[in-house]
Amino acid sequence: MKREKILLIDGHSILSRAFYGVPFLNNKEGIPTNGIYGFLNILFKEIELEETEYVAVAFDVPKPTFRHKLFPEYKGTRKGMPEELKEQVPLLQELLRKMHMPLLMMEGFEADDILGTVAKQMQAEGKEVVVVSGDRDLLQLSDEHIKISIPKTSKGETKVYSYYPKDVEEEWGVSPIEFIDLKALMGDSSDNIPGVPGMGEKTATWIIQKYKSIEEAYAHAEDPEFKVPRKPSAGKDLKENFELAKLSKELATINIHVPISLNFSDCKWENYANSESKELIRKWEFRSLYSRFEEAESTAEKKLSLPAWKDVEDPYLAKIAFKDAKKQKSAGIFLQADPSDGGKLYVYLCLSDTRLYRIPLSLCEEELTELLKEGEYFTLQLKDQYHLWEELLEGEIHDLSLGAYLLNPLKDSYAYDDLARDYMDLVLPGKKELQNTAEEGLYSAFVSWQAKNRIFQELKDTEQWELYRDVEEPLVPVLFRMEKAGILVDKEALLSYGEELKKNIAMLQEEIYSMAGEEFNINSPQQLGGILFEKMQLPGGKKTKTGYSTAVDVLEKLQEDYPIVGKILEYRTYSKLNSTYAEGLSNYVGEDQRIHGSFQQMVTATGRLSSTEPNLQNIPIRTEMGRVFRSVFIPKEGSVFLDADYSQVELRLLASLSKDEKLIEAYRKDADIHRVTASEVFHVPLEEVTPELRRNAKAVNFGIVYGISAFGLSEGLSISRQEAKEYIERYFTSYPKVKEYLDGEVAFAREHSFVKTLFGRRRPLPEIHASNFMRRSFSERVAMNAPIQGTAADIIKKAMVIVDQKLSEKNCQSRIVLQIHDELLLEVVKEELETVKDILISAMEHVVSLPVPLIVEATVGNNWDEAH
């Protein structure tokens, strides 16, 4: 008869493994959750793998155990648990209780002892036992009907390694019970079990394989045949330290007689997905686990189903639906093409909790156009819908995805299921789980209607309503028009430059082969590292797991003394330019010879726009080769490019927000701010500031905006860390209110876990209290910079809205074609140049009133490079 199976889990061990194996996660409230998330994934994986219905979890109690009485220094060398991990222990225990899972804990004993006791008890009761732990100490429990399962999580993926007695012997060369003696000899630094001084794993294994126990080994330690290979003193070491070995054995032995028992039937894996557990899963935003909890939900609690919806094919019924919508002057709307129906466009209309329609656009264009003339409507991902049917521009349509983005800009998705979970407390199937395109449209219209009130209220509660209404929403049609217009490319010039690059790459390749004395794959870091640091014996080689590091910072230090390195860096530059720009850009040129990229409004945490397909914001500008690529972007015939760029916008904002009198005065006098800073920081008269001092001051000025450290500045300027530290200190002495302002932003972040821009945009900082120094320091730097960078993003977005509006009012044919952070590029009809230039400069400079005025530099050219 097949034995029933039970899963016994080492709670702290698996939580810890998961914490270090899963990238850091937190929910919108800043609660760290990666350990819990990883634990649950391991739990579900083990349950499926073992096909069991019985589970229990053991935890350590944060109090001394019997082992501490034996040896007060037990585990004394362990570092304290990181705060982010410690926080997750009670949260996980709360969740497991709500999942009706037995939690096993007892003062004076470790989880290992409880697991050992219960495992042996269950085996004696005729059960098959699987003990899940990240601790190999439990291998001693392995038995005929007790399997030890050790999961290892890396990069979010979990692999499970299983051990019955034969597996333990195969890997360690000893039986499970002998594993205790092995540890007694070699010790365990993680638990501060001393072992026999100087005795490593190989020596200990030889001894236990031959003598089976430390007691037997001790009895034969002086025998002539007690000859451990390459360790002649092993017998003597054991004799002299036998008391230590015995103590170590006692510490390493799992106590299987803990006064605890477990009722097998209490461990039944059922009703774990109930309203209480699901509430925590939603709160912690474990999106990928929602469906698992929903599927397991009891029949009394069903997954939300869509209200009955009508697939309208009758023109008369379509008119009735739109008549109802027009009467209430409000609806959830979503427009979508159905690829399974030849790309046919459908309108999804939600009028209430119970009235939901799918109507072919061809059946209701007139009605929809009429509907949009009055009232307000709600949708998701509005810009994508503009591309399907431009007439949507005529209506007052609110994009709730944008609102959700402002409320939590750290998320990577603002689809219907995200909004349902966050603002309706509903779990909906994700896009990949849907049966057809219609369901996505129906859910999107339904969620748009249902989530609107809560999203709008939260925008008001967080003082971001004006930002949403006056900046983000009006920007959507502007970005649509930019995408639709695209930017013209001289494809012939682009391909010609690509051919030139290929020739240079081929020539450099031959030169590198010649210098190396053989052919190899220059693009392979492993092969390149072998050539440079083994064959050619170049200094400074940093060995990694996969070979030598050939990162840019490593090679740049060698290029002056070793010509081959300079050629390699040049080769890499040309190769990247060719693949990313020459070939990459040409793939995006459409039949109209224009690139129609995408501008993403809901990607960055600071509010900056992001350019994709292709990324036109990162085309190099400071190199000659980068400028050549900019030159292939040209205006249409009869037009020119007008480029407007804010001058030092972030430094001007720093001066304005900090209210530092010296900085403000320098800008008001139109002084060279870098020369002024050099004079202040290096204590030299203004007229004696050298180009080098100005360069260093410039690095300090821009570095301060980004919360630069002494180390970062020293690396950037190739100076000592002490010098860099002094530069920063002198800067803050010269501009004390800047220091006061930046410290104030960090203090605000510590109190509120977010910072905000001048326009109220919030940048959450969930790791501002992280125990990990690197993560905490990064959050502090973001706290200093995000209000400045975010305000700059808000300013140019608002300027874009004004410029677009003014161009429309003046009936101009000119248009914005690109936004590159602090820069706008317009394709301007020559006859409109002066008018458009005035509109552009005025809008950008007067978008907000600040102590330090915003200054815009505008230039004209026949290609993008000329215009910049």
In which residue ranges do the predicted regions lie?
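C-terminal polymerase-core module
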Residues: A506-E510, S514-V565, T733-R781, N785, ...
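Function-dense linear segments that define catalytic or interfacial modules
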Residues: C350-D353, S401-G430, L442-V447, Q601-P685
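Conserved catalytic core of nucleic-acid polymerases
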Residues: K484, H596-G597, Q601-T604, S679-C812, ...
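Active-site palm subdomain of RNA-directed nucleic acid polymerases
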Residues: L459-V471, L475, I795, A799-I820, ...
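Active-site-proximal helix-loop-helix substrate-binding element of RNase H-like nuclease domains
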Residues: K155-K159, P165-K183, P307, D341-D461, ...
